[in-house]
Amino acid sequence: LFPPALGPISQPFDLKESHFAVDIVVKENTPIKAIADGTVIFSEWTAETGYVIILEHSSGILSVYKHNASLTKKQGDSVLSGEVIATAGNTGELSTGFHLHFELWMDGYPMNPENFFNFSEE
């Protein structure tokens, strides 16, 4: 698996608070990368979370990337692990600064991305 972006975590995964993601602080237009080979199943603008892209991977895994400045792939595209799929931004009503809101789902259940990735820049 390939980390989508590197940077400090501003808000961790928290089931009790229904924050099914990690928020990774990044600079504007940081390349956002696919965590694994997959297919784009959603690539659109949403009012609350800005430009969103969702990838479907093997073994029932979905990866979700929100608040992007732009998307470089469209629905139906195949992507490779580490391929740039978006640029980081601060889009959508719920964004509080430049960051990547990154979700990982397995068989319909949210997973803590920090159990699978090291987001540290060191």
PLM features: what roles do these ranges have?
Residues 22-25, 52-57, 101-103:
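Short, acidic/hydrophobic/Gly-rich beta-strand patch recurrent on exposed beta strands
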Residues 23, 54, 64, 87, ...:
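Conserved beta-strand positions that form and line the central face of beta-propeller blades
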Residues 12, 43-44, 71, 88-91, ...:
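Residue-level recognition of beta-strand microenvironments
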